Amino acid sequence: MPLPGTPGPVTTSPQTPTPRPLTTDWRILSGKGSGGSARAVSKLRSSSSGNSLLRIRDLGVRKSQEEAAPPSPRPQSRAHAQTTNPYWADTNTRPGAHPPEHGGVAALPAQVVGQCHQEATED
């Protein structure tokens, strides 16, 4: 029995390894181990692919920072963009854009359709 004021038995919990941040290692991508690493580094520095590998590493860091930030709200939904787009407004009002039950060409009187066709062929 321990005396009062003295520490009791020390219990140690098994330590779990802390997860390492995900980084891109040039040795993995180039397929080279420790052998010839100086040559690989100089080759990476002189080539354009070296810049892209560095960019990949930067993107990984930046992406992890973005995941921590709350997502920004989208400015507008896709349906709203379609209703305000002049192209969609044009196709919704032009005759023939919809099937006959929705006001297409067949819903117009036959003489109007013929007149439009005649004007189009005269040009």
From Swiss-Prot:
It comes from Homo sapiens (Human). It comes from the Eukaryota. Residues 80-94 have a biased composition (Polar residues). Residues 43-54 have a biased composition (Low complexity). Residues 55-66 have a biased composition (Basic and acidic residues). This is Putative uncharacterized protein FLJ44636. Residues 1-105 are annotated as: Disordered.
